[in-house]
Amino acid sequence: MVRYRMRSPSEGPHQGPGQDHEREEQGQGQGLSPERVEDYGRTHRGHHHHRHRRCSRKRLHRIHKRRRSCRRRRRHSCRHRRRHRRGCRRSRRRRRCRCRKCRRHHH
């Protein structure tokens, strides 16, 4: 304990400028923090806006897919499977389209 007490006054003035240097770094950090916050806010806003655009695009793409009549898809599948026409007919009977147009047509 005595040795530590003897060292502390000798380290005291040495720690002083060290603490001041740390404070300067903290000051610089505080000076940069609002700029970083602004930059982060901009990037975050941009990312959020871009994310919203992606979401809307996905929704529009889904709506566009829904608007397409599945008959086109089925015709394409039938053309693709010309050899297996019977299997395609069975799949047509089993799988009915959920779109309103096909429901109205079937009912």
UniProtKB/Swiss-Prot annotation:
A GO cellular component annotation in the UniProt record: nucleosome
Pfam families for the chain: Protamine_P2
GO MF annotation, one: zinc ion binding
Keyword Nucleus: yes
Composition-biased stretches (Basic residues): 43-94
Modified residues (Phosphoserine): S8, S10, S33
Region (Disordered): 1-94
Major localization class: nucleus
Keywords attached to this entry: Chromosome, Developmental protein, Differentiation, DNA condensation, DNA-binding, Nucleosome core, Nucleus, Phosphoprotein, Spermatogenesis
Disruption phenotype: Male mice are sterile due to reduced compaction of chromatin in sperm.
GO biological process: chromosome condensation; nucleus organization; spermatid development; spermatogenesis
InterPro entries: PRM2
Role noted for this protein: Protamines substitute for histones in the chromatin of sperm during the haploid phase of spermatogenesis. They compact sperm DNA into a highly condensed, stable and inactive complex.
Subunit structure: Interacts with TDRP.
Protein name as it appears in the record: Protamine-2
Source organism of the structure: Mus musculus (Mouse)
The gene coding this protein: Prm2
